[in-house]
């Protein structure tokens, strides 16, 4: 499978929007616009890497907006113009060398997974692909408040982002076209002789440029929602040690759980359940065991990340349910603390967090005390 990276362009000042706060940090559904945009790509199962390109003065704003989205690459600073910023972003990816790169406006927070799918799919056959909408309105060219000409709209398209490219091709094109001030990245590849395909765009994938655009996005964002159910399952074997960590609670035990992180099986199962609600892959995609950053890591990082993806998409966690399978240790004395800890991480009421336990009647690996297993179910709601 091709390695896909996403560059989120958020280095502009948004002069047409007005105000002191750049538009990408204005709030939509109580969260910064840019956070929603980042989360859409971080949650996509085929996007392996996400990096923002930001203004040098926006480090603190970006840090607050991206807080809790643990899998993002470090942001890079942009240049004087959008084209400069994108080139710098592309250069920053040379060490990871993706096959494809998606370049997206930070102020398009309502991009959906199906549109991203279409762009990625087109790159198998074309060096570039962009989402676009056929022009439906009659077009007029005029000056001084008067119509000078009616323009034939046949074959005209409104370009959107994410604009997708084979990485080597768009990097070479940006290097060759530096300083030419082209209006989008497709134009950069075109100028270098590359072919760019069109795929279906989406009306809701509009760029927020004015306050009226933000009001429209807010109406779409807060529309009637849908419910999603996800499930997760995890197992960790028991080895040397004198405690186990279950749902964030350290419990004395004759053995310890073995794993790359803290081996918190029920919290891992719950993380997978939440990611499943979003069709966002599994915990191993977001936090691969090959990455030493997560060696011995507190699993609350993983769970908080999954919850942040849901919140950034305008969703709410309605309830979660976890069952721990083990003979020992006894879970009952720790159940209330487990529920409270999970509720704290997920920022929901403990009444929405069910923690249960069962034995397997001394059958199987859990019955023999070789490991601990857990299964989890989550119910969330997302706006349409």
UniProtKB/Swiss-Prot annotation:
Pfam families: IspD, YgbB. SUPFAM superfamilies: IpsF-like (SSF69765), Nucleotide-diphospho-sugar transferases (SSF53448). GO terms for molecular function: 2-C-methyl-D-erythritol 2,4-cyclodiphosphate synthase activity; 2-C-methyl-D-erythritol 4-phosphate cytidylyltransferase activity; metal ion binding. The record marks 16, 23, 260, 359 as: Transition state stabilizer. A divalent metal cation binds at residues 234, 236, 268. Its cofactor is a divalent metal cation. Pathway: Isoprenoid biosynthesis; isopentenyl diphosphate biosynthesis via DXP pathway; isopentenyl diphosphate from 1-deoxy-D-xylulose 5-phosphate: step 2/6; Isoprenoid biosynthesis; isopentenyl diphosphate biosynthesis via DXP pathway; isopentenyl diphosphate from 1-deoxy-D-xylulose 5-phosphate: step 4/6. The record marks 153, 207 as: Positions MEP for the nucleophilic attack. PANTHER family: 2-C-METHYL-D-ERYTHRITOL 2,4-CYCLODIPHOSPHATE SYNTHASE, CHLOROPLASTIC. In the N-terminal section; belongs to the IspD/TarI cytidylyltransferase family. IspD subfamily. This is Bifunctional enzyme IspD/IspF.
């Amino acid at each position: 499978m091709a390695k896909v990276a996403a560059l989120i362009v958020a280095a502009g000042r948004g002069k047409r929007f007005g105000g002191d706060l750049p538009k990408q940090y204005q709030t939509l559904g109580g969260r910064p616009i840019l956070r929603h945009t980042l989360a859409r790509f971080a949650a996509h199962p085929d996007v392996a890497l996400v990096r923002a390109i930001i203004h040098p003065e926006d480090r603190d704003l970006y840090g607050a907006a991206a807080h809790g989205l643990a899998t993002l690459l470090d942001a890079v600073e942009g240049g004087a113009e959008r084209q400069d910023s994108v080139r710098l972003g592309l250069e920053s990816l040379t060490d990871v060398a993706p096959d494809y790169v998606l370049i997206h406006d930070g102020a398009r927070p309502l991009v959906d997974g199906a549109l991203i799918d279409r762009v990625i799919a087109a790159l198998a056959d074309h060096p570039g692909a962009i989402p676009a909408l056929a022009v439906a309105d009659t077009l007029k060219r005029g000056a001084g408040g008067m119509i000078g000409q009616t323009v034939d709209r046949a074959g005209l398209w409104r370009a959107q982002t994410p604009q997708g490219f084979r990485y080597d091709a768009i990097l070479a094109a940006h290097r060759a076209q530096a300083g030419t001030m082209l209006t989008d990245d497709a134009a950069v590849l075109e100028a270098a002789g590359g072919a760019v395909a069109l795929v279906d765009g989406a009306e809701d994938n509009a760029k927020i440029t004015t306050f009226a655009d933000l009001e429209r996005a807010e109406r779409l964002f807060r529309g009637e929602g849908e419910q999603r159910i996800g499930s997760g399952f995890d197992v960790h074997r028991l080895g040397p040690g004198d405690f186990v960590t279950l749902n964030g609670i350290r419990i004395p035990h004759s053995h310890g759980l073995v794993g790359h992180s803290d081996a918190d099986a029920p919290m891992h199962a719950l993380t997978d359940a939440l990611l499943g609600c979003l069709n966002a892959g599994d915990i191993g995609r977001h936090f691969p065991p090959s990455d030493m950053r997560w060696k011995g890591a507190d699993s609350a990082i993983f769970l908080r990340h999954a919850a942040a993806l849901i919140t950034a998409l305008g969703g709410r966690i309605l309830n979660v349910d976890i069952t721990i399978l083990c003979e020992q240790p006894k879970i009952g004395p720790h159940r209330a603390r487990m529920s409270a800890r999970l509720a704290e991480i997920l920022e929901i009421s403990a009444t929405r967090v069910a923690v249960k336990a069962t034995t397997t009647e001394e059958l199987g690996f859990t019955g023999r005390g070789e490991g601990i297993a857990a299964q989890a179910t989550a119910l969330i709601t997302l706006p349409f």
